[in-house]
Curated annotation (Swiss-Prot):
The lineage of its organism: Bacteria, Pseudomonadati, Chlamydiota, Chlamydiia, Chlamydiales. SUPFAM superfamilies: Chelatase. One of its GO terms (biological process) is heme biosynthetic process. Its EC number is 4.98.1.1. This is Ferrochelatase. It holds the Pfam family Ferrochelatase. It comes from Chlamydia muridarum (strain MoPn / Nigg). Catalyzes the ferrous insertion into protoporphyrin IX. CDD domains: Ferrochelatase_C (cd00419), Ferrochelatase_N (cd03411). NCBIfam families: hemH. One of its GO terms (molecular function) is ferrochelatase activity. GO terms for cellular component: cytoplasm.
Length: 317
């Protein structure tokens, strides 16, 4: 029987897991490497993670000291398993406390393994990092991967209906709205290495926006250097539109977590409100029945990648 691996970013379940979560994230060379020699990378970013832990803990305090992404991913895995009538194992990339259980479950599995990273758009830094994680730890277990689904008809229709439901609940029509579609940012050096992320985000945005008025922007810049533009922060500071409502859609994130619940809700939405706009923030699709059904269709109809080395960020030596 085929076994499915549902992979997400992970997030601290309790405040005590914030330091280890941040350390795992920032010491991942697929995320923060590239310009720094490998011998220096881990000690440098271990130090940075320790320095940033208090500030990040203050941000998580707005969420009750934890991220909902763990529970939402677990629930989604259970519901997807019922929909597919097949085993679904969860994986939380930067929640290291859960890794041994995931690896043990995969080692015990007897069937084919298909990985499903919960990221609509492929990037070396996230989906590539997840693929590398398993190539390095269980090379004896061949895996196939669904690497992206940002223009899959089921994802597009799911997002359109989800946004429409949100507008209906607010008594708003799309003609009165300017849509701000926000996705995670990425350093330009990744794009220059051949990362397809920017093009996939643009293609996905084009498929979603239709005849509506809107913009694609990039959030969550970290560190120095050139990143994809325009940034969500800059758009919120400078946007001029005659539309009655700004609808913020974090469509690069299928799960609400710190980058939606803190960064968007507590940093960017207030910027727009202070400038006199009426703002609607569309929640992530999370564990909705519509998303479970759409994801099952995506799993059944998407191609599976098995030649994996070209999908990984070139390593600096």
């Amino acid at each position: 029987m085929t076994v499915y691996l549902l992979a997400n970013f992970g997030g601290p379940r309790i405040s005590q897991e914030i330091p280890s979560f941040l350390h795992a994230l920032l010491t991942d060379q697929d995320v923060t490497g590239g310009r720094i020699p490998p011998w220096l990378h881990r000690p440098l970013f271990s130090y940075i993670a320790k320095r940033r832990a208090h500030r990040v803990a203050e941000q998580y305090a707005y969420l009750g000291g934890r991220s909902p992404i763990f529970q939402d991913t677990e629930k989604l895995a259970q519901n997807l398993s019922q929909e597919l009538q097949a085993p679904v194992i969860s994986f939380h990339r930067y929640l290291t406390e859960t890794h041994q259980d995931t690896l043990a479950a995969l080692r015990e599995s007897a069937g084919d393994i298909i990985g499903i990273p919960l990221f609509p758009h492929y990037t070396f830094a996230v989906t590539g990092s997840i693929i590398r994680f398993f190539l390095e730890r269980i090379p004896e277990k061949p895996m196939a991967w669904i690497t992206h689904f940002g223009v899959h008809p089921q994802f597009i229709s799911c997002m359109r209906e989800h946004i429409q439901d949100c507008l209906i609940a607010q008594g708003i029509v799309a003609e009165d709205c300017f849509f701000l579609f926000s996705v995670h940012g990425l350093p330009m050096r990744h794009i220059r290495l051949g990362d397809p992320y920017a093009k996939q985000c643009q293609d996905s945005f084009n498929a979603l926006i239709g005849e509506s008025e809107g913009v694609l922007s990039f959030q969550s810049k970290f560190g120095i250097g050139e990143w994809l533009v325009p940034s969500t922060k800059e758009i919120c500071q400078s946007l001029c539109t005659k539309k009655r409502y700004i609808v913020v859609v974090p469509f690069g994130f299928v799960s609400d977590h710190i980058e939606t619940l803190y960064e968007i809700d507590h940093l960017y939405v207030p910027m727009l409100l202070q400038r006199g706009y009426r703002v609607v923030r569309v929640p992530a699709i999370n564990t909705s029945d519509r998303w479970v059904s759409a994801l099952a269709s995506i799993v059944k109809s998407s191609p599976h990648e098995t030649i994996l080395e070209p999908l990984l960020m070139p390593k600096r030596r």
